[in-house]
Amino acid sequence: MIPEERLDQITQRFQYLEAAMADGASGSDIAALAKEYSDLRPVVEQIAAWRQLCADMDEARAMLSDPDMKALAEEELPLLKARLPEAEQALQLALLPKDAADARPAMLEIRPGTGGDEAALFAGDLLRMYQRYAEARGWKLELIELQETELGGIKEVVARISGENVFARLKYESGVHRVQRVPETESGGRIHTSAATVAVLPEAQDVDIQIDPGDIRIDTMRSSGAGGQHVNTTDSAVRITHLPSGIVVTSSEKSQHRNREIAMQVLKTRLYDLERQRLDRERSASRSAQVGTGDRSERIRTYNFPQGRMTDHRINLTLYKLDAVMQGDLDEVIDALAADGQARMLAEMGQ
């Protein structure tokens, strides 16, 4: 059942925003109004389409009592009824609550798990996969912290990704990614299993998190590259420790001032993420957990190189195009995860 009262409220709010912008709101007000207007516009369009279809059906039913129009009505009414389920689903999807963080940039963190050198190499493969995906979508990926191994793997990487709907797409990537393949150093041809952990965090804004200067300790140190080699001669790298939570953030750009800015932004993002996780746990106490907001220790995906397949365990999706996936072709799996998340939310709305 579609709530007519809510549809009226949304339509009235949209009309108010339209009038307010036409009257010439100024400064930050106009930006906020324009953002809300843009968000509501597709919803209002779905409302109008659904209401027009309902009106057309009512008109066709009324025509049944008119001998001159009955034949036409009997022809049109089944066609209109056939369009109704699709229109209702489109409207229900438009009415689903939006995650305010979906449009934000994201922090991508990748760390090797079990598997030693092979896990570190796989972490590097995942980074390249996301770099190619970001490039394909026209996003900007900036490396904030990159610690490499002597074999070319990754001990840890933190990157910032900005662009359209970055977090909305990448939030499903958080979790444990497992790889099954024969390492290049394996002379016996045995398949090894290793893993890497991916975390995708929506970037915090100043209004989200306020940090007490007394709660942090800032240390400077020398930047280091692969194998711990010093890559510049000044103590430009910055490490910030948030004492209440124990979170430690580092940044190793050449500018110490820039490193402080970057490290503080990463710290705010991690603290914001902790708060989002707390709220998610509270909400999940009264509803089923949604895909994309689960435990990051959960194994979400397996990349099997000998069989050329990728399996996402959350939705039991298997794709036999591993080479394409590793080259950044992720839309098919992300679209499926997003659709599953929407279906779960629709089911909960109907309970």
UniProtKB/Swiss-Prot annotation:
One of its GO terms (molecular function) is translation release factor activity, codon specific. SUPFAM superfamilies: Release factor. PROSITE patterns: RF_PROK_I. It comes from the Bacteria. Keywords: Cytoplasm, Methylation, Protein biosynthesis. The modification N5-methylglutamine is found at residue 229. Peptide chain release factor 1 directs the termination of translation in response to the peptide chain termination codons UAG and UAA. NCBIfam families: prfA, PRK00591.1. This is Peptide chain release factor 1. It comes from Ruegeria pomeroyi (strain ATCC 700808 / DSM 15171 / DSS-3) (Silicibacter pomeroyi).
